[in-house]
Amino acid sequence: MIRKLLLSILFLFAVKISAQEDKSRFSLGFNYGFGSEFNNRNYTFTNHFYKIQLYYKLKQTKHFQYQILVQPEINFAEHQLLNFYFVKPETPDYEQKRAQYIQLKDIREYVLNCGFLVRKPIGEICSFYILGSIGPMITDTETERMSKGFAFADVLAVGFSLNYHKIQFDIRPNIRHVSNGGLSSTNSGYNTRNIEFGVSYSL
């Protein structure tokens, strides 16, 4: 439901953007972040990632600013199954899969997230914001929690920004969920907590 609502909002904003062009509304940025799974006895998952971010300022009111953004991302992760009983005996070749999945794995995720951001300026140079984003991704490794291939990444973040002329510095804690949306039988996915640091430039 949340995913459908965000997609509808992004579509409406994209239509509005196509009807008006104003280059001063755009910013281009780069973020680096890292994180790990919430405490979990079944598996470990640690990651670090790089994002390019294209912001578009949709609207400015007296108290708030509204932006949309596109975020191409590459994510480098390490995952290991800790509780091999997570792979049930009814799973085909379950003993072989247990032996396979319990090994430490390197995972690459290639993501294209689209987000909606609500910003609250504090004075002239500072602001706080809330960001929600969703998007498709490709993962290159099968695990006991998710099939290899197509999936989705959902992110909910809060952030703090500091502006200096046309440059903006960001710190952004977030919660991230990835899964394949039921497109494959293996769909437990991952839940991680992360923090990002970024810089962007107003074009």
Stretches found by the model and what they are:
Residues 162, 190-203:
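Outer-membrane beta-barrel "beta-signal"
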Residues 51-139:
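Gram-negative (and chloroplast) outer-membrane scaffold detector with strong preference
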Residues 26-32, 66-72, 114, 130-134, ...:
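Membrane-embedded beta-strand positions of outer-membrane beta-barrel proteins
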Residues 5, 20-28, 62-68, 124-130, ...:
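Outer-envelope beta-barrel architecture signal
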Residues 19-68, 72, 202:
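Short glycine/proline- and aromatic-enriched beta-strand/turn motifs that initiate or cap beta-hairpins
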Residues 37-42, 99-103, 140-146, 181-187:
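Extracellular loop and loop/strand-boundary signature of outer-membrane beta-barrel proteins
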Residues 22-26, 44-50, 64, 106-112, ...:
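Residues that define the transmembrane beta-barrel architecture of outer-membrane proteins
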Residues 32-38, 72-78, 118, 134-140, ...:
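Transmembrane beta-strands of outer-membrane beta-barrel pores
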